[in-house]
């Protein structure tokens, strides 16, 4: 599912339910499969694009998935985000008979992510906050705006990101979602709605003044019209 849809929280809850049946989720952390920066794709502004699935070493992911499903041990890579390179350090991994591989990723539905795995061995789950709520003018609240506010608070709390940075970066996120995630929603086995109606009052209390300020700040800035439109809408 898209950014800030609740994938990690859902993963924890899913693992707890499966454990009651004697099964165990084993996460394949695809963040460790990023290409070294010199091999990394760039966007139209020359910035490194971490939002695209092509930023990942898809052949190696498939190689490891095939080996794991065949009962073999693999050496999982480790990506050092400080150096922008894959470390020489690796971690061994081998599946037990009661273990299920979980790919917790923005791009879990992207066909090339699991092209080596037979379809009958996959269960595809999509998650997004599908809130059915209208504003005072009768317009539905956009799901992408909910996720934007979630990510602002998460990035500020856990990554020391100023919410302004998250807003200015969001058009990259949204472009990748529309290109690499949304087209494959119709291939999933089930959809989870992670919307919580009580979210919006909390976000208003924490971010309401900021959105008003951003709308005024970027109103006449031709380079940040996406940020202005999102801030004005929220």
Regions found by a protein language model. Name each.
Residues 26-29, 51, 101-103, 124-126, ...:
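Structured core elements
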Residues 16-26:
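Post-Walker A helix-loop "phosphate-sensing" segment adjacent to the P-loop in P-loop NTPases
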Residues 62-121, 166-184:
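Glycine-rich phosphate-binding loop used to anchor ATP phosphates in small-molecule kinases
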Residues 26-28, 35-84, 100:
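Conserved nucleotide-sensing/catalytic segment adjacent to the nucleotide-binding pocket
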Residues 115-234:
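Conserved NTP phosphate-binding and transfer environment spanning the P-loop NTPase/kinase superfamily
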Residues 2:
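P-loop (Walker A) phosphate-binding loop of NTP-binding proteins
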Residues 6:
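Conserved glycine(s) of the Walker
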Residues 9-14, 29:
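Hydrophobic positions on the alpha1 helix immediately C-terminal to the Walker A/P-loop
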């Amino acid at each position: 599912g898209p950014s800030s849809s609740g994938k990690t929280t859902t993963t924890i809850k899913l693992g707890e339910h499966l454990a009651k049946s004697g099964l165990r989720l084993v996460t394949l952390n695809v963040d460790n499969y990023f290409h070294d920066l010199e091999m990394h794709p760039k966007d139209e502004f020359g910035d490194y694009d971490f939002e695209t699935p092509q930023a990942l070493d898809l052949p190696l992911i498939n190689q490891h998935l095939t080996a794991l499903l065949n009962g073999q041990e693999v050496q999982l890579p480790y990506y050092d985000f400080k150096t922008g390179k894959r470390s020489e350090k690796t971690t061994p991994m081998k599946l037990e008979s009661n273990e299920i591989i979980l790919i917790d990723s923005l791009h879990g539905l992207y066909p090339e992510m699991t092209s080596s795995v037979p379809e009958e061995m996959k269960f595809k789950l999509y998650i997004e906050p599908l809130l059915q709520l209208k504003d005072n003018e009768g317009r539905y609240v956009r799901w992408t705006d909910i996720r934007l506010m979630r990510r602002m608070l998460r990035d500020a709390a856990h990554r020391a990101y100023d919410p302004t940075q998250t807003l200015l970066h969001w058009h990259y996120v949204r472009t990748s979602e529309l290109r690499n995630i949304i087209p494959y929603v119709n291939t999933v086995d089930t959809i989870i709605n992670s919307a919580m109606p009580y979210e919006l009052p909390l976000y208003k209390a924490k971010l309401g003044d900021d959105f008003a300020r951003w709308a005024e700040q970027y109103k006449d800035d031709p380079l940040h019209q996406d940020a202005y439109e999102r801030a004005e809408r929220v």
